[in-house]
């Protein structure tokens, strides 16, 4: 990792159907081997299922799920005099979003439903209702930070 220049942020184009930048980032995270059309199909089909089952706006469910999964605080390792401490630190907004997206996708891939569309729609609905593995991951992260609160003065 270069110390001279920080990488410049790339412009993310909003998705075609909803015109949302965060949704594009979500699709890009789902995508394998550059197959964006497959990722788009998975997300849009999952949104259709959410619309049928929840009878609400799927983008609202998606945003609520992201909000419920995003961590406010996490632990980072810090070495002090031969000992490694887990120091709780606040999470930047961009990282919160990235972690929430990653955790939702990981939780969806770990589910036992038949297709990725079913898994993703179920995980998004669960996350929007404060259930599911992605929310559990956030709770674990917060619990870990709370347990290591004594080391918060090592913050950098």
From Swiss-Prot:
GO terms (BP aspect): translation
Molecular-function GO terms, alphabetical: rRNA binding; structural constituent of ribosome; tRNA binding
Keyword check for Amino-acid biosynthesis: no
CDD domains, per the entry: uS7_Bacteria
Membrane-spanning ranges: none
Keywords noted in UniProt: Ribonucleoprotein, Ribosomal protein, RNA-binding, rRNA-binding, tRNA-binding
Record's signal peptide: none
Highest taxon above the source species: Bacteria
Pfam hit, one: Ribosomal_S7
GO cellular component: small ribosomal subunit
Keyword Chloroplast appears in the UniProt entry: no
PANTHER family found in the cross-reference section: RIBOSOMAL PROTEIN S7 (PTHR11205)
Described purpose of this protein according to its UniProt entry: One of the primary rRNA binding proteins, it binds directly to 16S rRNA where it nucleates assembly of the head domain of the 30S subunit. Is located at the subunit interface close to the decoding center, probably blocks exit of the E-site tRNA.
Quaternary structure and interacting proteins, as annotated: Part of the 30S ribosomal subunit. Contacts proteins S9 and S11.
Family indicated by similarity: Belongs to the universal ribosomal protein uS7 family.
Full protein name: Small ribosomal subunit protein uS7
Source organism: Methylocella silvestris (strain DSM 15510 / CIP 108128 / LMG 27833 / NCIMB 13906 / BL2)
